[in-house]
Each structure stands twice: as C-alpha cells, then as structure tokens.
C-alpha cells in the first residue's frame, strides 16, 4: 500500500497569438563535463515545422570567449525535439546564455541567461568512532563523488589534513591517491595528546571540499544507557513533572541501581532532588512550588545520575523538559495557500496534543473576518474543525480567529490569489515506483486536452520528454518506464493549453534507492560474543565495499562519524538544490521557459494541495576465554564477486553489547550504494559474566575480585564459578597455598545480576592474569573471560645498569669485571640480573623508542624525548645505509606521534612554551624549531612556514649585544637562568639557527652578532657546561676561535685512566660531556672521542636513553654522530660471561646487530667477569634491579601529608604540602614534580585537585595508570609552601593494604627529592571477606 498526499498545482498563464504555439524548455544551470538538453515543443497548428538556430555561448568577466556552440534544428508540428549539448571538461566560471533564433521566415528570437555551477564533486568522510582515547588509532575513509554519485574520473588524488584543537597540522597526505573514489588511512593518537575536537579536512585543487570532526578525550564506555522522558505531557496546571526513567544494558537487559534526580527551574537553580531504586524502569514525580509561566511553554532541566548496583558505574543524563500552558496546539490546514475570490475556500483547524495525537473535543468560537462567518463548534475525532468559506469577488483577505473556552487563542490571515483563469491540470500517481517497471499516472484537466507535454528532469538535466495527444479528453492515463537514469530522484512536469492559458503540474519522484543497489545482511541478529558471524553482500560485480562496525554505546557521544543514507541524499541535493521562486516556477524546477513574443508567462499560484509520489520500497564443550573487548571492528574493504555477491565470515568481539554494522559500495559506472540504515545486532549469551576489576593492586594485599552473573534462560539455576590460579600468580585467601583453582556455587535467578567475589592476594609483580569460568546446567551453558590487572611492588623499584664499551682496531683480548651495587636493605626476592651484549650502540634505543624515559613527560620540554630520538635514529639508519625497513618505519611512525604531541605546546605567536597556553620560551623554541627542521627530512607533515615563524620569533629576541635572554619562566637554571652572562642560552640558540640551512642564510646577521658576543666572552667562561655549548656553536659556525675553545674545554675535563674514560664534572655533566663529544666529532678527533663515549654509555638507562630530556637529546646525538663514523661491519669476536662457577659464550660477526640477552643469572650473584677476544666494537651491559623500602631515601624537599576527615569510608582526601630545602639562601629548584600514588582500590575522577595554593601555581596535571596516580608540575620550588588537596574514591575492596606514597623531585636533578608514605583505613581480611572466603581466624 502507498499513501497519497495532495500535490500543489502550478499554473502558467501564456497569452497565445492566433497562429502561434512554441515552447522552449531547458535547464537553468550548466556544469563542466555534463550533458545539457533542450526541449522544443511545436503546437503551432499552421506550420508543419519550424526551423531554429540554437547558440550556446559564454565569456569571462573580461570578455574572453570560453564557449561557442551552434546547432540548426527543425521541429515538426505536434512534436517535441530534444537537442543535446556536451559541455567541455575544462568549462570555467563565466557569463553564459542560450539564444534561439527562427530561420527561413519564422520570426522568433529569445535569450536565456544560464547559471554556471562550479560544484561538480562532493566529498564524505567516515571515521570508525566518534570519540577516541589517548593512544587509540583513528581509522578514516574519504569518499569523492561527482554529480551522478560516481567516482569523479578526472580527480586522481586529494589533499588530506588532520589538525588538533589548536588548528596545528598533525598529519597530512599531500597526494592521497583514490581507489574507486576512496582514500583510506589512519592516525595513531599519542598517549598524551591535546584533548578536544580534532578535524579532518579534504582539499581538491586548493579548495576545501569536506571536513569532519572527532573528539579525543579520556572516557569509559558505559555498558548501559539511561533514558529519561515525561510519563505524561507536563502542563502548568499539573504543577509537577512526572518522569519515567529506563536503564538498560546495551544488549537489552534491565539494569538495577539508584537514580538520583535533580530538578532545575528558573535561572537554572536547583529546585529539588529525589532518589529512587530502579530495576530497568521506574517513575518519579517532582512537584513544583507555585510555578508560573510567562509564555505558552517553558523548559525546565532535569539531571538524572544513575548508579549501577554492585559496581558503582554511573551514567549521567540531562534533559530539557517542556512544560506547556495548554494541552494542545492548533494549525490551519488549507486547501491551497491562498483563496480565489468568488470561489469556495476549504480549510480546517487541526488540533493536536503535544505528543502528536489528535486533540478531540476542543470547543470554541470560530470567527472569520470579511465574510461574516461565526460559529461555536468542537473538534472531531481526528482533531479537526472543518470550514468551507465563501469569499466574495471583492474579498481581499480572510482573518481566521479561534477562541477556546479555556482561554486558548489562535489567529491567521489568508490572502487572495492573483490569477485570470480557473483552469488547472493535475498529476496523480496510480502505481508504486519500482526500478525498470511502468509507472502509471492519471493526468486530469478541467478543460478537454488536445495535447499535453511531459518532461522528466534528474540530476540537473532533462532526461526524457514526450508530446501526448489525449483526443480532447479531460483524463488520460500516462505510463512511463522508471529508468535507472531517474534514480535516485527525479521530477515530472506536465503542461497543456486550456483556452488561452498554459497550465501545468509537477511532481517529485524519490526512488529511495541508488543505481548501485548494494545490499548487506547478516545471518543472525543475536549471537554469542567471540563467535563467527556471516555477512552477505550483493551489488555490482567488482564494486568496492567499505565495512565498519562499532559499539552502540559510542552513539551516546555522537553519531556524525559514520555514513548514513541521509548523508547521500544531502550530497545529491547539494548538487541539484534549487531555490524556490514564487515568481518563476520554472526556475524553481531548475528550468527556464521561452515562447513567442505575444505569449506571456504570468506568476502561478497553488489551487490544490500536492501529491507527493511514494517510493517503491516494500512494506560440553571446549571453553574459550573472552579477551577481545574492542569498541569498533570490521574496518575492512572487500570487492563484490563476479556473480554480484560476496560472503564474509568474521569473529565478533567478546563484549556483551549491541553493535551497529554499516556498509557502502562504489562502482565506477553505477556509483555509490549504501544500506538504508545500520544493521543492529546483539552479542549476548544465555548465561554470562561481567567483570569489575581494579586497574592495579599491590603484591601481598588481600583484594576482592568482583564479578556479576546474568541468566537469560527463564528459570533459576545453580552456577559453578571457578577462578583459576594462572601460573601460580595468585593466592586464595583462606585456602591452601597449593590450590590451582577455587570454585564457588551461587543461585542465579533469571534476568537479575547476581554478584559473586573472590578474595585473593597477588604473589608476583607484573601482569597477573585473572581467568574465571562459570557454568550452569551441568556445563551445558558456560562463559569464561580473561583479563589482566597490574601487580605493583610494595616498595620502589631501583633499576641499575653497569656498562663497558670496547673498540678493537686489531685483534685483542680483554677482561671486564662487574661488581653489582645492590643495597643491603633490598627486599628479599626482588633482585633481577641480566647480561646484555650490544654490537650496535643504538640498537636498544631503537627497540625502546616508544618508552625511553620512565619519568613523566608532561611539559613541552620533557615531551621532546618522544620526538628527538627518532630523528637521531633515522639519521643513523640512513647514514649507515641500513636495510632494516621495519626499523625505519617504526622510527618514522613514532616521529609523527612525537610531532603530534609537541604541537600542543605551540603558542599563538609561533613560538613554543613549556605548557599549553603558558607563554613563550626562547630555550624551548630553539630546541623545538631545530628539531622539527631536521625531522622534516623524514616526514612531510611538518609545515616549513611554522618552523620559519618559530625561528623568526627567536631571532627577534636577540639583545643588541648579540646575547639571548629567556623571556619565559625559568625551569632549567643552568640553561635559562641568565647566570654567567647568558652564554649557555646564547650558544644554544645559535646552534639552532646554524643547524637550519634556511635560517643560517636568513638570519646570518643574527648569527654573526651572537658569535661576536661568544668570542668576546670566551676568555671569561669558566663553567664547563657553558663552554661545551659555546664550543659546539663555534664548531658549527667554523669560527676562527673554535680550536682555542676546544683546547680550553679539554683542559677542564676529568680523565679516569683505569676505565679509559673522559668526562666533565658539573651539575649537568651528561649534557656537558655530550656537547664536548659533538665538538670532538666535528673536529674529526674520533679516537680522542672514544674515552668520552666510554663515559657516556656508562650513564645510560636500561632503555638506552639518559636520565632526562636534554641529557637524552644531546647524549644520543653525540653517540649517533660518532657511531656513524664507527661501522660494525668488521665485528668478529667471542664473549665469555663468567658468574659463580658458570660460563656462557657469545659469538659475534658483522651480520649480527641484534642484542644478545642472557637472563638466567641467579639473584644472589654479586660479581660477573666478561672476557672479549677478537676485533670490532660493542657494548657490554649488566642490568639489575631490586626493590627498596620507601623509607630509605634522603630528603632535599620538605614534604607533609595530612589525611582529612570526609565522613565516608569510600572517599579519601589527602592534603599535600611541599617546599624546597635550599643549600643557599633564596635558591630554588628546577622544574619540580609531585607524584601522588593512591592506595589499592582507590582511583581519582577527572578533576581530583582542589584547594591549591596560588603563590606558585600548579602548571599541569596528569592522571596516570588508570586513575591510580596523579602528577603535578611546578615551574620551580623555593621555600614557599606549595599545597593542594587530592580527592580519590574507593571502587574496590582491599585488605592488608600496603602503604602508598607521595614523591617530590627536581626534574633536572633527581638527587634532589623527598618521599613519604601514608596509609588509609587498615581493614583486615575478616572485614571484607564473604563467609566462605574467610580464613579460620575470622570464624572464632
């Protein structure tokens, strides 16, 4: 069945001469590379044919001709003639017109201006999710379409840019190649990105075509959703809002919990709040207190916080609820927008309730001005009061007024129509619309028709036309084939002559389908998690198909990330949308019409409602553990097979939820196809487990692991639930130590979440697998899942590394002794010892590029450790001709992530700052700019103009003396402090300019002035740190005093002949020694650099990095430069590792560059001996670690902790105060960090810090490790007290809690620190265990 809706009739009045009848109709718009069709109809009864000259021409604004096409045509009597013009591909913007001239004695001349449409392509963007967490990967597709929704043949690539919330370019693809009109790629979001709304934009030929946003934020995907709606439509007279609250898991089952409801009235002030227990659905009434409305409707705000039972997971919903003064509204439904004087005018008052249902029984008085109409009446069962009014010939306006007995009032004016005829023609659909099927239309006219003309328009052109002769009938059955050319939308126009008037009607055809009839279906609507699902696709053979599936819960954030049927309709309408024009109806159809001089087109008005044409749419077993909990999946491209179909089998994730599956297809000939709406299916089990596990616990603590069981089988069953002791990592409290599993039984009624818990202790540090299985009905229904929680040490881990570097130019044999420095107070069982042989200096750096520093990196300078080492590694790999493409790819990818991270700290003036929006820093801008310039060799995302702007800003900060001083805050005193005449910072800035080829030329004067300043200061430089950077700057500049500076620097060095090491003793000795090594390399003193390298490699961390950012940056740079000169191609040696009475052998040749590891060294080993014999070079490393109780640290900060009384067992408020203890009066630390770790079971929310002191404000805050740690950053600390309060909440039950700690330290000198432990509630096992878990001592 299909429904008819009355269509409006368009009447064109044409004054016709006695012997003339000609109509020319054509599109009003032209586009490049598109067909243009003109239709000429001859209804001249005297001439058997007319001859015409058609001329299509165009010129630019300055008169240059861009189009000139002519055609001679003849049109026979009572016939149509369709004339096609093919527009050239290179058609450009200009002034276009078509001219029609009569020939061979036929007098006719008409012109029509045509509008050039430049938009010939459009774009769409699809993203796999609307919101992303830090560290996620963004998958996206760009789709380009032409006016026929096909891949544009002339566009081969696009320019794609991704920008962060500050509009910094994070990634760009300058020539993103299209396949079937699609470009697909991804972006790895870094773990510490700029949070907010990001943007993907697509450009073609320099113009933006389409863009889309997505959000990056910290979030937890809710397992359930809450809906809040009025139980009844609220009215002022009710003085209350009645709400229905529904809470359901995404897989459809009800949620049990507590709903906290808050009502806000005028000025958004809290009016009242209530709490109610809800199981799936609940209702609550919130009564007003004398609520008075100023208008017919007013919004109030309702906030509902729903807290799930057992887990405390919370969903917050806010709703605007409209309160109405009256229970109904009214609308005037008119036969036509205007009335005709002297003819009956039918209309009706339509009364509806605010939920859309008819409002019957509404009584009131109806009055109509100017016609003397007045009556009291009541709305019928359809909510209608029907009126038939009789306007006279002199009536100009009808004023329709309604007054109800309850005070409701309505008024509307209706104007008369300006017309000279009562004739009209009507087009009605008599059949469904189906592709390649006949459509039947009934054409009805008030006059007998000798002929009528029909036109079919689609995609901006006339695709069909016909001249019909109904033999003087008033009705005619028109049959047209629904061709593919009409899809997806078309218009049909009919016209005839009635007396001296041409009347016409038109209708819209919406096929609700596309030429590429793509279809997608799945074999099951409900499936168990982790099982296979079969997708069936059909469409055009060989067509591209893009698939995506995502968790329905993501739609709570946004749904604009995906592609929907409505998006395609908007793209199509964007090409072909026409502005309505009541004075030119042909223009409203995208056409123009021209006829003879004595025929006049008058404005047309509607006489009846329109018919909207309806579309043709028809009305004991092996248990697998669930470990895959993706939020989006099935991001896949496939092709339709030759048969026009394709099947695909995929494994669904292990999440129990509802999924949305979407798909589209593109064919070069038939264009785009997309499914009408996403396919929704549910992953659910008849019986399943939901976990609520903590992020981390400490070894030895007694922890309650909480699970919830769900049973959808309709009857109550006894469930056996087993927790496994995987790899002997777990101890079951109150059970024998040898138990490998623990099984409990619990009764599980249907459709109710039943909690069950296990009390355990973790035996080992690291990751602990939590594996649980539950079964009912003797194992016929089972579920099992496995997740990992982190087991943290009770003490603080102390990593150590001893190294020795050897470089043998000829065959040698040497023994290297290693004595392990393990603290006597180290915790028992915490020692780990490893030997590592590294034939390549940078191998470990490459392996650990994504995790070089364990310390926080939450400011603009520290963050560079995620960027700079990748540049150095790439420099090394390319310099040594490495064939390790996977290493190059890894470093390049991490380089992009580091760049993405760093753009958070770019300031509006082009410089860089230590914090977001904190102001500029000379030091950091120099550091970043030179690094990005170097990085641009390996990634094209870096904007050269951005680097140039930073260097320009830098150059503008030079003092007239040539010196540079820091403009921003000082957090690295030796570099920025301005002490010792600012030599260090001036040298640092000069190195940045000298290492940039463009800046070196552009700012040559700045460099020269700076070098003059340094050379004048050289004799007075007595600090090794200052001299090392100044010497390196002189080396880069090729300054005449570079040798003098290097000799002076060497004189300041310290040599250790026993270890064959050289270094410079100062507060920044790693950085100083690294700059010295860079100068050695530039002076080609490679052999002299070996002892310096020996010392540097002994300062490295396990990861291959150095303790801090600048150490790592300069240290790796220096080692890289020397390593490029020393090739491992001659390596050929044997290494003997001796410990206790054991010996282990390693043989190394030039083919081996990977690290050799040996882990099986007993923890009681105190001494190792390593012998190397052969030729070549390598690095010997002994890595060891032990845990040390937190009380064994010396303090250089004063740190005080105070637990505040909250009155709740579930809330922790900790007051933290710290200040620096100076050795000299008024001295201060460098950048200082305070890290607060929380006791097991406690986590913070998004804004945990309050009551902070403002004398020395907190600059940045990071929440780490799943909310179990908070890091605060200060520019520096002095003797002032720096205090704040951190608030955390207990989410999990833990007994025998280990103490937590707070640590404060100087980032650039970690020897300056303080650490304090604190404890919260001292619960014992008996207080948190359930009866069957409790050990024997609890039962006494």
Curated annotation (Swiss-Prot):
Name of the gene encoding the protein in the UniProt record: TEP1
SUBUNIT field: Heterodimer of a TEP1-N chain and an TEP1-C chain non-covalently linked. Forms a complex composed of TEP1-N and TEP1-C heterodimer, LRIM1 and APL1C; the interaction stabilizes TEP1-N and TEP1-C heterodimer, prevents its binding to tissues while circulating in the hemolymph and protects the thioester bond from hydrolysis. Mature TEP1 and to a lesser extent full-length TEP1 interact with SPCLIP1; the interaction is induced by microbial infection.
Cross-link (Isoglutamyl cysteine thioester (Cys-Gln)): 859-862
Domain of life the protein comes from: Eukaryota
May contain the cleavage site: annotated segments: 580-609
Protein name as it appears in the record: Thioester-containing protein 1 allele S1
Matches recorded under InterPro entries: A-macroglobulin_rcpt-bd (IPR009048), A-macroglobulin_rcpt-bd_sf (IPR036595), A2M/Complement_sys (IPR050473), A2M_N_BRD (IPR011625), A2M_TED (IPR041813), Alpha-macroglob_thiol-ester_cl (IPR047565), Alpha-macroglobulin_TED (IPR011626), Ig-like_fold (IPR013783)
Residues carrying covalently attached carbohydrate according to the record: 68, 199, 242, 312, 481, 637, 728, 813, 828
The keyword Secreted is assigned to this record: yes
